[in-house]
From Swiss-Prot:
Positions of region (Disordered): 590-633, 836-1129
InterPro entries: EIF3A (IPR027512), eIF3a_PCI_TPR-like (IPR054711), PCI_dom (IPR000717)
Domain PCI: 319-502
Similarity comment: Belongs to the eIF-3 subunit A family.
GO cellular component labels: eukaryotic 43S preinitiation complex; eukaryotic 48S preinitiation complex; eukaryotic translation initiation factor 3 complex; eukaryotic translation initiation factor 3 complex, eIF3e; eukaryotic translation initiation factor 3 complex, eIF3m; multi-eIF complex
Keywords: Cytoplasm, Initiation factor, Protein biosynthesis, RNA-binding
Quaternary structure, from the entry: Component of the eukaryotic translation initiation factor 3 (eIF-3) complex. The eIF-3 complex interacts with pix.
Protein biosynthesis in keyword set: yes
Record-given protein name: Eukaryotic translation initiation factor 3 subunit A
One example GO MF annotation: mRNA binding
Main function: RNA-binding component of the eukaryotic translation initiation factor 3 (eIF-3) complex, which is involved in protein synthesis of a specialized repertoire of mRNAs and, together with other initiation factors, stimulates binding of mRNA and methionyl-tRNAi to the 40S ribosome. The eIF-3 complex specifically targets and initiates translation of a subset of mRNAs involved in cell proliferation.
Organism: Drosophila mojavensis
Amino acid sequence: MARYTQRPENALKRANEFIEVGKPLRALDTLQEVFRNKRWNYAYSETVIEPLMFKYLYLCVELKKSHIAKEGLFQYRNMFQLVNVNSLENVIRGYLKMAEEHTEAAQAQSSAAVAVLELDDLDNIATPESILMSAVCGEDAQDRSDRTILLPWVKFLWESYCQCLELLRVNTHCEALYHDIARMAFQFCLKYNRKSEFRRLCDKLRKHLEDICKSSNQTTGVSINKVETQQLCLDTRLYLLDSAIQMELWQEAYKAIEDIHGLMAMSKKTPVPKTMANYYQKLAMVFSKAGNQLFHAAALLKLFQLTRELKKNLTKDDLQRMAAHVLLATLSIPLPSAHPEFDRFIEADKSPLEKAQKLAVLLGLPQPPTRVSLIREVVRLNVPNLVSEDFRNLYNWLEVDFNPLNLCKRIQSIVDTIEASETENTLLTPYIQSLKDVTIMRLIRQISQVYESIEFKRLLELAPFCNIFELEKLLVESVRHNDMQIRIDHQRNSIYFGTDLTESQREYRPDGPTLQSMPSEQIRSQLVNMSTVLTRAVSIVYPNRERDQRAKLRSQMVQHYHEIKDREHQRILQRQKIIEDRKEFIEKQNNAREEEEARRHEEESRKAKLAEQKRLEQEQEERERKRHENEIQAIKEKSLKEKVQQISQTAHGKKMLSKLDEEGIKKLDAEQIAMRESEELQRERKELQSKLKSQEKKIDYFERAKRLEEIPLFEKYLAEKNVKDKEFWEATEATRIENAIAERKDAVSQQERLKRMYPDRDEFLEALKKERASLFVEKLKKFEIALAEERKKRLAERVVRRREERRQAYLRAKEEERFRKEEEIRLAREAEERAAAEARRLEREAEDEKRRQQYEKQRAKEEEAERKIQEDRERLAREVAVERERSEKERDVWRPRGDRSERPSAAPAGGASEWRRNAPTSDRNDRNDRNERNDRSDRNDRNDRSERIERSDRNDRPERKDTDGGADSSWRVRREPVEPQRERGGGAGGGPSGRDDKWRRGGDRSERLGGDRDRDRDRDSFRRNDGPRRDDDRGGFRRDDQPQRDTGSNWRDSPRQNDRDNRDNRRPAGDRRDIRGAGPKEGGGGGGGGNWRTAPSPRDEKPPVKRDQPQDKENKAGDDGEWTSVKRR
């Protein structure tokens, strides 16, 4: 499988490798992964992607994968439609060219296959198989071959054209390419005679044009308002019209004409005359094929007018030929019906008038033409004088002269002339039959004006080119449309005209030559004629009566005018004023409406911008979400593909994957695939073991049985083999002995023959040794000298070589020693660093463990203190409620809480019980009385608990020494940095606990009560006594300062203080807002009256010792613990 993310260059190289080994599908998958990967799509230029795209499309064409090619083309369009349109155009043209080449090759292959089949057997051309096949399917060999070989490629080419048109339909940069491909598709339909595909192509182009007309606001969209776009669309529709006419698809041709007319009407530029001439010519042809002679003649007349006006180099022969064509087409129009409204009772869809009006719009006519109007227009244009003498006579005979006895003979001579010269009058031949029908109708009408009755035989003699059946049909049609009054008597074989005087032929004068009116016409107009004659007679008998009546009427009119002229003048003035007022009112309304419309438009535009911005933001969020999902999905798919690729490399993995399809693999993840792989592996192992066991048992039984059966056969075979081997050995040995004896004899005879040559050999050797002795001695001396020199040279080289080897060995040893020392130093340094890191780690772990233990202790203390305080508060709340009821019953006089005269001075720095005894009669007095009645055992327990907490704090952290008296040490560790807190005033809960918990609460409410002077005084006291302030000292005042701050009485603070006290009693004990008012219940100070201006300075009193305030410590611990628990919640 292809890797998930490959660079385009690598993908192209890998695809070429797959193609070389004969795996085009793998190559296509590799390239397809690149286009599906959004990572590389927009990171490379067309020089890198274009070769990849050509290879991709080549593989799609080879494998006939049109849908995969469509996906790649759309991706490529999105990448380069705004960057490099030429690259996109080259890619699309190359793709279509490859598809066309393969289709043409398939067509040639199909023809060649048929030729081979036809020439296979010249002696037996019609085989039984071919005869049966032609009888069954009715197709010849070429059709079957085309269906098998050519048709798949034709389908692929058609899909390619459709995909490219869909790809480029909304891109203004590729508009010319779109129309070129449309023309190529038309040529394809013509070449392969694909009529159904041509209809679908026309519908597709019409749908594209409608989409362009509907929406033209896109960035790369095609605008129909541009002149270039309109011209391209017009040219394409004209080409479509030509193709439809060639394929004889007249319905599609008519739709194309409607599209062309719409484009010409939409265009601001007048179409060129050549285009209009082509349009009228094709329109006339379509009307002719549709059998609509009236509009066919009208289209030819428009073409004649256009050509005559705009074509300057028109010859006389061309003008005469065109005029004859127009004149004959106009005269061939069937005579109209007298009452066409009868057709509306027969038609099922639209009325004929609506259809005619629609067709007249295509010709640019204000109203539908008629035969009379066309003949009148022909005469106005002087067409009869432009044609030859024969056609001029034809017009006169049909429309001017009244000669029924010779009419058909004259027309027949014209018809013979047209038929005789077919080469020159090819365009006029289709009008012959229509011309004959019109001639017969003219003959019948003229005969009806001359004769009351006539025989069939005589009428057929007057109409030689018509038989009796056609004549009777025309007579019935005339009666059906109420053109004439005709009665046929078959018994006498005669025809009667105008016998019914109660019926009229028509209400207007008929067209054509007329001799006289019919009797029914005369009867119908008799009353009109009588009225005319009587009026003329009265005017003759009384010539002055009419003049007197006119004079009298004139005098009455003048008198009436003088009577009403003033009133009428005032009415006119009043009307003029009303009109002016109305105009002003309408103008104001229009201005107001325009302003309102402008405001509304502005508001709508603003809302649209906001909606668009919101939509863009939503789309951006949606894209980001989809991108994130796609990335996650891509990671999963990558992991899955890697796992599948890894599994597919094994035999059992391939077997497991073959059982799953692509959808099944996509539904699984990597773990499930691995699990199935292991299951498949285990199953294969079990199957293999069982097969091996059964095979082993089978082979064991088979071998044992085989060997038992082979024993007697082997014994018999061995006995026979021994006998044969003995015989063979004896024969071979005898042959060997004979050969050895013969060789011995030959060797002895050879030796005896050569003994006589020994003396000559010895003499030759002795002579040769004597001759070569001196030469041998000389060469031996030279060799010894060269040997000595070579020995010296090699000894010197060995000395130099050994010296260099010793030097290199010394350098290597020295370098190794240096490396060894550096390595020892490095190892020692690393050991020291590891030891230091280990020590730091152990130290951090010890500190973390110690901190955790301290936190555990602190948390246990806080939970215990919080639980106790909560119990005390609940109990105190119950007691407060009881005491309040009792005090309300005993109280005699109501007195405001904030009275300055009854507000006591600040409580001394003693315990909380003494402060409660000196408090005024109020809710605070009730609480002090209630606290005195508390159980002594509970107070002792709290004191013991406070002492234990203090001792543990002292042991855990060093005590912080403050010179301002009495602020106990804080054992809490600040969990997060906070902003500098403001000091708490002397309100409720203003004890020492405010210092440690303010960073959690974000400030104290009492700060708003105390004012700036309290803050300045407190700030000065801290600076004088505490030295530099730290972050953990920015809380409220210390508990030993609180009684001093509460001294005096301030009437400004008393309402708020009273409300706060009441609020403390109303709120439940567990409420978070109750924390601020919980201080005074068990702590010293806070909430009492007193004036802050008269309060003594904190440094005037000696701060009490910490151990003298166990109750304060308990309050602090409880308060901080509660706020700590709130923070944790």
